Amino acid sequence: SNAGLWGYEIGDVVRFVSVDPYRIIVVGRTKHFISAFGEHVIGEEVEYSLQQACQEFSVSVREFTVAPRVSKDQEKSCHEWFIEFDQPPADLHAFAQRVDSYLQQKNVYYKDLISGSILSPLQIQVVPKGGFINYMRSIGKLGGQNKVPRLSNDRVIADVLISFTSFN
């Protein structure tokens, strides 16, 4: 029955996996996106891109979040990824290139902004182990019911996480 759907908070993005019978899976939240430059990147695309690169480089991620970085000088704007790895990849630059490549495959608007030299490819900031826990503790939201948003269309989380990264 559809009784369970009435308990859903509006804002979930769902995908139908079957129409007979009707079956859906939750693939994200409408408020978790980045479109600071018109790219309309959603959580499903980001998670896919990161997962593929992690498999390719044999690394695992504890936690991550992504935010836009709007440049105020000659440098182009980009997406800034804050990632806490179990063990970082040996070649972080190559890893970032693969994540970016997968994201371009999934999102044509993002690809157009990169190929049109509007945006620079994404940049990764490595968050030391425990960095996200420290962040959640610092905002009073440490606990199982609270999660770090994967995507933010602003820099509220990113600006705090900068102080926890190994590359300031």
Predicted segments, located by residue:
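AMP-binding adenylation
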Residues: S1-N168
